C-alpha cells in the first residue's frame, strides 16, 4: 500500500527588538548567563508586565508579509505549565485570537513549479529560559531568553513531501528576514522548527495519526528527519501496526528519530485571558503605517533583477536568498557597478572567502564602495583579474580604497610598451636555450616566453598588451 505524506510546520521566530516583550531588559543574544534579566523575568511578586509596542509592530509586519488577516481587537492569554525555565509557571501567549490568521506563502519547488502553502495563524508570545545540565550533577537555569519576544507561525498541513517543507522554510525565512523583524539565525536559536507528520492511504480524506518532530536545528535536518519518519511510519502501517501520537526528536548522529514522550491526548494548558495586560485595538492607521515600512520582497526583487538588470534566473535567486547579500548588491549597482560583474564577485570570490573564514558579509571589511572601485580598476586596465583576487582579500580583511592600496603595494598593471619591450628583450637574453628552441622551429616553444615574461614582471604585465608585444618581438627574433 502506498501512502500520502501530510506535513505541517510550527516555526518560532525571535523578533529583533532591543528589549523583551514585557520587560525593559535587553533581548540581545550572547551575553553572560542571567545578565539580561530583571524582576519581571524572575517573576517577583507584585511586578507587572508592560507590552513592548515594537513587538506588536513586528507582528503586524509579519502578518502583512504573509498575506494574513489581522485581529484588530488584541489580548493576551496565560498558558499554564510548570518547568524550571518558566519561573511564573505560565507563559504569556495568544490562544483564540492570534495577531494574524488565514494567510499563505508561495514557494518554489525543485522542479521549478510553485505552490501556495496556507498559514493557519501567527501569534505573539514570550520565550522561556534555558536549562543546562552540568557534569557536576546539577542543572542550571539561564533566564536571558526568558521574555524574549517570539512569533509562532503555524502552517496548514499543506505540504506533501520533505522537499516541500524545505521549500516552505526557505521562503518563510526570506520573507521574515526581508520584513526586517528577525535575523532568523537557526544557530543562535532565533528560528526554531517543529514538524508534524502523518501518513494516510491515497484517496483518504481523514488525516492519519501525527507524530511531532523536535530538535530540528537546520533546514537540512528538517528534511532528513521527515524522510526518516516517513519510512518509519510506512513500515509500521504496512506491517499492520498503528501509529501512536508521539513526540520524537531527530538524532543527527544516527539519522533517526527517537521517542521523547507519548501523547495520550491534547495537553490542557488551562488558557485564560491575561489579567495583567489590558485589551487594546490595532487601528487601520497603525496597520497602514506598518505596511509602508515593508520593503520590496524577494519575489519582486528577483523579477526586477532579471527584467531590468539582465541577470539570469539563477543569479537572481542566489542574490536574493539572503537580504544582506541582496542589499549589498543593490548598493553596489546604485554606485555604478556593472550588475553582472558585481553578481559574479559576490557569488564567486566573496562567497568562497566567507565560507573559508566562517564569516558573514557583515563581519568582513568589504563594502559596496570598495568592491565597485576594484571592478572599475579591473575594467580600466589598472590591475589584472589575477591581481584583483589578491586585492579583494586585502579589502575583505582590512577595508580601505582599492586604487589606493594597489598603488601603494606596487600592483599597478604594466601596459606601457616602452617599459614592456626592454623587459621582453631581457627575457630573451636570460633564456638562450628557449630562444634556440624557438628559432629551430620546436613546437610550442613560443609558449614558454609568456611564463618568463609574467615572472619577470611579477604578474603585473597587462596580458593583452604583453602578448601582443611578445608576438611582435618574437617575429623579429625569428627574422634575425
From Swiss-Prot:
Superkingdom of the organism of origin: Bacteria
SUPFAM superfamilies attached to this UniProt entry: GatB/YqeY motif, Glutamine synthetase/guanido kinase
Pfam families tied to this protein: GatB_N, GatB_Yqey
GO biological process: glutaminyl-tRNAGln biosynthesis via transamidation; translation
Reactions it catalyzes: L-glutamyl-tRNA(Gln) + L-glutamine + ATP + H2O = L-glutaminyl-tRNA(Gln) + L-glutamate + ADP + phosphate + H(+); L-aspartyl-tRNA(Asn) + L-glutamine + ATP + H2O = L-asparaginyl-tRNA(Asn) + L-glutamate + ADP + phosphate + 2 H(+)
Gene Ontology MF: a single term: asparaginyl-tRNA synthase (glutamine-hydrolyzing) activity
Keyword Protein biosynthesis in record: yes
Keywords (A to Z) from UniProt: ATP-binding, Ligase, Nucleotide-binding, Protein biosynthesis
EC number: 6.3.5.-
PROSITE patterns (UniProt xref): GATB
Keyword hit for Hydrolase: no
Family: Belongs to the GatB/GatE family. GatB subfamily.
Binding partners and assembly: Heterotrimer of A, B and C subunits.
NCBIfam families, alphabetized: gatB, PRK05477.1-1, PRK05477.1-2, PRK05477.1-4
HAMAP family in the cross-refs: GatB (MF_00121)
Function: Allows the formation of correctly charged Asn-tRNA(Asn) or Gln-tRNA(Gln) through the transamidation of misacylated Asp-tRNA(Asn) or Glu-tRNA(Gln) in organisms which lack either or both of asparaginyl-tRNA or glutaminyl-tRNA synthetases. The reaction takes place in the presence of glutamine and ATP through an activated phospho-Asp-tRNA(Asn) or phospho-Glu-tRNA(Gln).
Protein known as: Aspartyl/glutamyl-tRNA(Asn/Gln) amidotransferase subunit B
Record organism: Streptococcus pneumoniae (strain P1031)
